[in-house]
Amino acid sequence: MEEEGGGRSCGTTRELQKLKQQAMEYYRENDVPRRLEELLNSTFYLQPADVYGHLANCFSKLAKPPTICKIVGKDVLDGLGLPTLQVDIFCTIQNFPKNVCSVVISTHFEVHENALPELAKAEEAERASAVSTAVQWVNSTITHELQGMAPSDQAEVDHLLRIFFASKVQEDKGRKELEKSLEYSTVPTPLPPVPPPPPPPPPTKKKGQKPGRKDTITEKPIAPAEPVEPVLSGSMAIGAVSLAVAKACAMLLNKPLYLNIALLKHNQEQPTTLSMPLLMVSLVSCGKSSSGKLNLMKEVICIPHPELTTKQGVEMLMEMQKHINKIIEMPSPPKAETKKGHDGSKRGQQQITGKMSHLGCLTINCDSIEQPLLLIQEICANLGLELGTNLHLAINCAGHELMDYNKGKYEVIMGTYKNAAEMVDLYVDLINKYPSIIALIDPFRKEDSEQWDSIYHALGSRCYIIAGTASKSISKLLEQGNISIPKSNGLIIKHTNQTTMSDLVEITNLIDSKKHITVFGSTEGESSDDSLVDLAVGLGVRFIKLGGLSRGERVTKYNRLLTIEEELVQNGTLGFKEEHTFFYFNEEAEKAAEALEAAAAREPLVPTFPTQGVEESAETGASSG
């Protein structure tokens, strides 16, 4: 019995020795004894008040870097109560999974206030499907693809996201081709062709035309509307995950997101200063959705002088907004004059009424082009401000919303139609009369390229001609490498759909290289996420366009701007914007620039990010950034 007990004791001792040996090897491999000795020695000399807090901080620096362990997509509501996508990033930090950050991306869908019920219902279903597909992508393939990656490896993350998206594009292409082939197999025998319609009757004599006078002017037919650039359902998952990873990296490094984006922009070299983007604040809206006759001005936008800080600009525009509210609340004075103006409207004073729009500004009823501009002039005079000195104006014309395709003309004011050539004259006259207007956004449809050229050459030396809706998606711009169609000297870019952080860096570099200005814009249906402000600051864009100073989802972003400006002031890294400069190229300069571009195109280019060239083998026609 004693021998048996001694054998068990000997076996236990051998097992303990073996465990001790394994422990020694484990700690030695991880350099624990040396590091622990150094840490304890240094702690003794420092003698911190919180000894365990000090040890915890030191050990955390020795821990493995965080890696992505899970990405979760959720269906949430935006500022208008419509579905959109939220992405949560979970990382393994010191052996435990932790929720690091969340982002909400806005959808690309426009807000149609007066849309037909059937169209609104169809878009609602399309939006719901897009968000549902995005959630599915995030929670299945994307979370597995990025598992174990470091959030700091933004370029590689974006590379994998683009590969994934390219595969989805190919899947969608194959599905559509299959559906097409099935349709062809069931199509009945076509009917004989319908004869062409008879030629239109000669134009009737215009009112006021003298007898015997022949009207020899024949208007050129308008170019048909181009097909809307398709958006692959679910594509917002790519942009949302890319942003979420960038934000997670910033939070893990205890840095603001804008600084992380600035490092991406400057090849990981921290810039000495960062400038705040100039504000483009929507003050009033007089577009198609307003109750007045004026359609031309979807947004009348105020731009504070570049020398003003963001805080000073916001305070000034808040005072202007208060004055507009007072004017709307004032009772209507009795009409003493009933003569008619040039546009057929009564010249007597009309009470201005308004309602809050989804853009965060007041939609007011105006019957002439001058009315909202005179209103702003009056407010500036009351506040001791001078247009063209303290602030400038921009007009979002939303040309694509003004076209009446039955008449082939733009309906500038209800019942007043102008062809594309007449619109050029209208804008030139407007800028001549109101030189404080320094930017026109989407003055035409994108199809009216001839008029874009005309207005650029007529006004480009004193006014920014900016393409927003008229521009192509970021994906297409990067694919083609051409931002000059339509002719403009500025672009509005937005973070939507499959646009990654690497894409934003690349497109802003491209815009900068062409001496164009970049406007970072919000979408029509925004969420309360304020990340796009950090993107604008980090990318160093010229302007930021967030809508008006009302509605929580927009005010949140203005508050973030103020916070960032305060941080930069405290850090001594706030740079300042230069005066407005209009880079205008005449035809000779344009030809010289095109020759240089052609020469540069013959040289092999090294991609800045590995996301470039991923989709060369895939059809990108189903994409939109």
From Swiss-Prot:
Domain of life: Eukaryota
Catalytic activity: (2R)-2-phosphoglycerate = phosphoenolpyruvate + H2O
GO BP term, pick one: glycolytic process
Post-translational modification: Synthesized as an approximately 70-kDa precursor, which then undergoes proteolytic cleavage to an approximately 60-kDa enzyme; HOATZ associates directly or indirectly with ENO4 to mediate this process before its transport to mature flagella.
GO cellular component, as recorded: phosphopyruvate hydratase complex
InterPro entries, A to Z: DD_ENO4, Enolase, Enolase-like_C_sf, Enolase-like_N, Enolase_C, Enolase_N
CDD domains listed in its UniProt record: DD_ENO4
Pathway: Carbohydrate degradation; glycolysis; pyruvate from D-glyceraldehyde 3-phosphate: step 4/5
SMART domains recorded: Enolase_C, Enolase_N
Subunit text: Interacts with ENO1 and AKAP4.
Protein name: Enolase 4
Species assigned in the record: Homo sapiens
Gene: ENO4
